[in-house]
Amino acid sequence: MKRDDEVTGRLPVQPISQDVLVQKYLKPGEQGADDLFQRVAAALASVEKEELRDTWRERFLANLQAGAIGAGRIMSAAGTGLEATLINCFVQPVGDCIQGQDADGYPGIYEALREAAETMRRGGGVGYDFSRIRPRGAAVRATASLASGPCSYIDVFDRSCSTVESAGARRGAQMGVLRIDHPDVLEFITAKRTPGRWSNFNVSVAVSDAFMQALEADGDWALVHRAQPGGALIAQGAVKEGDRWVYRRLPARALWDTVMRSAYDFAEPGILFTDTINKDNNLRELERIDATNPCGEQPLPPYGCCDLGPVILPRFVRHPFSIGGKAGFDFDAFGAAVAVQVRALDNVLDLSFWPLPQQRAEAMAKRRIGVGFTGLGDALAMLCLRYDEAEGREMAARIARTLRDAAYAASVALAREKGAFPAFDAQSHLAPGTFASRLDPALQAQIREHGLRNSHLVSIAPTGTVSLAFADNASNGIEPAFSWTYRRKKREADGSVSEYQVEDHAWRLYRFLGGDIERLPAYFVSALSMPASAHLAMMEAVQPYVDTAISKTVNVPAEFPYADFKGLYQQAWNAGLKGLATYRPNTIVGSVLDAAPAQAQPEAQAAAVAADPMRAQIESRPKGALNALADKIEYWTSQGRQTLYLVVSFLPLADGRERAVEFFMPVGQNGESQQWVTASMRLLSLAARGGFLERALADMRKVAWDRGPVRLGHYRKADGTLVPQWHDSEVAAIAFAIQNLIARRGNLEEGASPDGASSIEAPAPMAGAKCPECGAHAMIRKDGCDFCTQCGHVGSCG
């Protein structure tokens, strides 16, 4: 049968794929993916016995070439000699104290912050459970004060992430989790309704079975913590029950509605069903899991790690689209690739640099890995199967079962060769109810006899940039394709704008093989063209074969009824899923943007500057009266509507033009910002008379503060519609207003006007983290990965 990789080998490389490969993965001297594979294979083989290294280097290389790749950190850092971790993500414990350790041995808040900063500096993303931190208003006996609560400390962790630059220039993502019974859960749920707050975090609520049962019974729910409340909270009704304090009770349905409203309108929080996670855990007798990595596919104990590597499913489709023969999936080749991948990821644990000794100790004790797959949506289309129909789900389940069985069998073989993981105990590992207890009896017998090399083996992660770079933009992870093609504009470092046609792998392969893309077959079904129930049904089909979790986003249309939306989460819990994230385009947050900073034009030659009256240096303010324009500037901050009056003075030029030479703010205006806005105007006046006004305004547009985005003006999208524009600070917003004011008089340099910001052809943007590429607060979780709905940028966890 004709292999898909033989066909795709003749496909021209997409420019976007080549650029991602070069920018994120290739190292100096590497010319292409094969050079990179050589580097990674040699690194993985280096931890084998010396007499086996050449053999395994060749096998690892062949497996990489066949489509079994590592996660982003492995492909980027393996074999480089950098002290950067090969692990994508970790879970960082956080205790209920400031320094040292709390009563249960968890690191204090600022010790946890230090450890997380070191982890991110080395290239890892971090997940946290903040539930141990005492609530706002709880008593702090050591200082006779009241606690500020976990949300205030999440602000600190968020700002730290903004400051820390990760190894390899990738800023680590973060996941914040809070239990549904924490007294501050309402504040946590609604925190990200403020645009830009916690922009470096995904957030999820840990929901227990007890809460879901209270919800079904329409009962009350207690918000509890073991920390004693302050006097005011006790006066309001907080009472002690056993070893904990009940801070308040409220209807479970009211609390759930707050969660659902935020998810429906603001795309967060996600939901983690932590009781399901812990009951299914092979190591449930040894550990408690309360958090996940930032993308949710790895529920992890304190200091646990994500050692992940997907296998590209379209590479194992034979006769795609039944062209030249009946389409089929090569299960034997896939199983063989999975077996080699288990060894490769097990070697990563020994090869990796570990940011913290606790992380290394945890990894060595349990040797968690996560073999997964990517490109499921594309593979099903190539097999002429619809993602949203029973036949497609049956094929996906068969693929997942093959993955599970091949991975566990390979881990048994590794245990025979290298030894079982130190914490292995057959009785507890195979106890009724664990994931391993559902394996085939013959495989369980082998585990009892020989043990397992790895406590966990399967994880369906998002693939983000590795899918772009190594899989020809195949659909991510378990997801269907989000769209078959779109255009993406990217602002380069020199200020120029590059435009890409981004195409889905299956779509472009179908065209390459002679298919009519104007009349796509019915099995080409995208994420937004199928019902939400189909997304959940696919998770239900695959989850039984995954010993950790699945990172997946359930896409629903903007008009999806709220009642049905809430029902998705109830259905997910009833189905035994371990979590759920949703994506719904909507009008409330669909316009929360932050325009790319205006770019300064390249400096002209000195002689040209001197000859240009708009840029010639003026030693001092011209004497006498100048034409002036006063402008009222209205903008919105987290404190509400704000107003400033600014005056701009213009110098008439001989050619009839006017040059802005003076900016000031009349005295007597209220507000603590007046002094630094006034100072900025004085500096801008000096810049204007020095001939570099445009550059100064562009620099001001980049100024950021820590009080959240500022709304002023509008952004014009590619289709001509206007949406509100957001800025990183008050100064940045005022600079934007000045650019508009000068542009209205026709005196701003060409290309330096606020309209110079690039418009992006993309789906309607949603509120989220700030995109590092276009600047919009539109980074959401799509396909379980960070994705900018404004410009198409794919971020972390890929």
Predicted stretch roles:
Residues 1-86, 90-93, 241, 256-265, ...:
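Acidic/polar, glycine-rich intrinsically disordered N-terminal extensions of enzymes
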Residues 2-57, 142-156, 168-281, 310, ...:
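Conserved, charged catalytic cores of large soluble enzymes
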Residues 11, 297-299, 345-350, 433-437, ...:
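Catalytic alpha/beta core of large soluble enzyme barrels
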Residues 27, 41-48, 61-142, 150-153, ...:
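Function-dense linear segments that define catalytic or interfacial modules
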Residues 337-360, 364, 368, 386-463, ...:
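Internal maturation/activation junctions in enzymes
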Residues 444-446, 595-645, 759-767:
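Short, Gly/Pro- and small/polar-rich lid/capping loops
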Residues 771-774, 788-791:
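Short cysteine-rich clusters marking metal-coordination/redox-active sites
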Residues 792-798:
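Short Cys/His-rich micro-motifs in 6-15 aa windows
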